[in-house]
Amino acid sequence: MKSHNISRRRLIQIGGVVIAMPALIGTAAAQAKIAARIAHNEAIGSPLTQAFENWTKLLNEKSGGRIEAAHFPAGQLGSYTQNIEQNRLGAIQITTGGPDTEETLAPEIAATGGAPGFIFRDDAHVDRVLQGEIGAEVSRIARAKTGVEFVDYGEVGFRHILSKRKVTNIDEVKGLKIRVPELKVWVDFWKKVGANPTPLPYAEQYSALSTGLIDALEADVFSIKGFKWGEQAKHLTYTSHWFLPKAVRVNARWLDALPADLQKLVRDSAKQVFAEQRRQNRANAAKTLEELKASGITVYQLSDAPKWRAATESLYAEFSAKSPATKAMIDRIRGLAGS
């Protein structure tokens, strides 16, 4: 039988390594960085994209380097739908998108995403809903049903029609091939006013305008400017038909796995950054509209806004029928409209 003799010096060396191992492991753990991929489809240069850029830097700095956040705007990591799905799965830790995306999984919170149209009166109404009890409740529901926490709400403002031909009343929208998000509630809305809604991915709008697949789209002024859609369509009709809040979506499993101080940092810094984003968005909307005018876009006001509201009013009952909770949410939102 072979004998295995270990010298005294070798034994001391081995012992030293064993003793040092916990310290080495601890040092490695302390140096390990927590990846946070922030990906979305908002336009480069928009107030919302700038807010995510600011938040990325803040997370990196305030975490002392423990969080390694990286920002991927304008669809760099996939389409809107892909970003939402990857966020739910945890492959993308943070994204943004309207609560209307939850039309199927949680219709009661889709109402806070502007569904079913003309539900928000103005910015003050939006704040009463999302910065109060309803906003917090919506986040809890999203967490339970989708695995994503809404840590705050950014915004891009009210949406309007950008088209290749003039639209100033409900008769002129008849048959208009307009791009809409790939959600039933949006299709239903535009059918009610007589348009021809065409569901398409967000990133395909420029090419769809250029090829004639669509005649129009609907969006906020910042996106119209940022994605240069005005190069293909020169008529902007101020309809304010939809206000789409941009929920700041954080994967709940990722968030829960963070140390307590970093969880607090993520939530608190989001509130700080996106409060300023909302202020900036509202302060710059009029300026951005003037820039669109200067680029050659003609701006119109609806001459018959009450007819649009009347044509889509039945959507409230139809959407409310999805569940008692959905009806209750719509009633609460409308009840906060003010005088």
What are these language model-derived features?
Residues K2-I25, Q31-R128, I134-A136, R140-S339:
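N-terminal secretory/targeting leader peptides
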